[in-house]
Amino acid sequence: MSSHRRKAKGRNRRSHRAMRVAHLELATYELAATESNPESSHPGYEAAMADRPQPGWRESLKMRVSKPFGMLMLSIWILLFVCYYLSYYLCSGSSYFVLANGHILPNSENAHGQSLEEDSALEALLNFFFPTTCNLRENQVAKPCNELQDLSESECLRHKCCFSSSGTTSFKCFAPFRDVPKQMMQMFGLGAISLILVCLPIYCRSLFWRSEPADDLQRQDNRVVTGLKKQRRKRKRKSEMLQKAARGREEHGDE
């Protein structure tokens, strides 16, 4: 009986010693893995990284577009207001513009509401930036065309002036008026279109630049998650191997 008890105690000591060695090796391996990757030492970090939901393409697009799009819209509105006030000050000058040869700028429409032909590209450009009209508004004083009052309709149109047969003024042929609302709208539209054409390539380029770091960060996150999963699988296999080795030692000691 005493010999049997001694053998049982010896087997128990050997099994306990083998289990302690296995636990010590496992703890050493986990400590080395933790030092190589400090982020994995936080409790629940691996599970949080593995179970973290990946953002969809809509959320990613919103994150990338929100900040530069807001800055772009703010700059567009600021420049539009600047263009509006500049056009207002440009339009607040004289009521008509006289060319160097003494002719009045071609009006946008004659007394019959028909458009006059543009004689040259320069006149077309000036007519765009300085449009004129023959509509007489309140608090406007009509001036004779080239200081000539008694002109026939053909001569008046040849001088690119406005002819009125209704007798609303003391003379029938008068100089056209500056079309301030039309000029302001044209300047405003030109500024808006120019701003969009200038800022759109810059915005697209900045969006492309922002997408590259985001893709790199996403790839780095995927690599970290993959590495953590591999380390977890290695530790699991290592613990299983140590447990099998401990059982084998125990069985060998029993024999």
Swiss-Prot record:
It is found in: Membrane. It is a multi-pass membrane protein. Residues 125-184 form the P-type domain. Residues 90-183 are extracellular. Its main location: membrane. The keyword Transmembrane helix applies. The keyword Transferase does not apply. The chain crosses the membrane at residues 69-89, 184-204. Residues 220-255 are annotated as: Disordered. Testis-specific. Expressed in melanoma, sarcoma, lung, breast, bladder, esophageal and ovarian cancers. Keywords: Membrane, Transmembrane, Transmembrane helix. GO terms for cellular component: membrane. InterPro entries: FMR1-like. Residues 229-238 have a biased composition (Basic residues). Residues 1-68, 205-255 are cytoplasmic. PANTHER family: FMR1 NEIGHBOR PROTEIN, FRAGILE X MENTAL RETARDATION 1 NEIGHBOR PROTEIN. This is FMR1 neighbor protein. It comes from Homo sapiens.
